[in-house]
Amino acid sequence: IDHLASGPRHLFSGWPVAAVPEVAAGLYSIWKGDQFVYIGMSGRSASSEELERRRQIGKTFGLFNRLAAHASGRRSGDQFCVYVADIFVLPQLTSAQIKAISQRQITLDSLVKKYIHDHLSFRFMETSDGATALRIEAEIKDGSLGIKPLLNPTP
């Protein structure tokens, strides 16, 4: 799991990132500079057999789709993007931006996407199945990397 703290960083501004497998269960850590912001996983219910079946189909699944959703900045159905909006974007909004959002001249989601692309990067690791990813995610939320994520630590 040290790879999630010290492995190669990938910028959200470079999405899609070729290194991310198109079909995989696994984990990802999100960083703002050297600050550990978030830990996430994808492929929760996927067995190794299910992952292989999906590879044969050739349709993206798991890590790729989850990171793509985060890169989009859309808050609907994406808790990470909600956290980014609440903790990083909303406190920085000017009165002019708030007015523009209320008049539908700009969207909050577009500002969330801009923030993610301008400030955040990620690391990832593939796991053999979703159950393994879920277990490791819980350990990391508890501090197994020596630090807890800012946005989603275990309370």
Predicted regions and their residues:
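Short, conserved catalytic or adaptor-binding loops enriched in Gly and charged residues
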Residues: 111-118
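Short, aromatic/basic-rich helix-turn unit that serves as a nucleic-acid recognition element
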Residues: 122
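GIY-YIG nuclease catalytic motif and its immediate N-terminal context
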Residues: 1-96, 101, 110, 125-146, ...
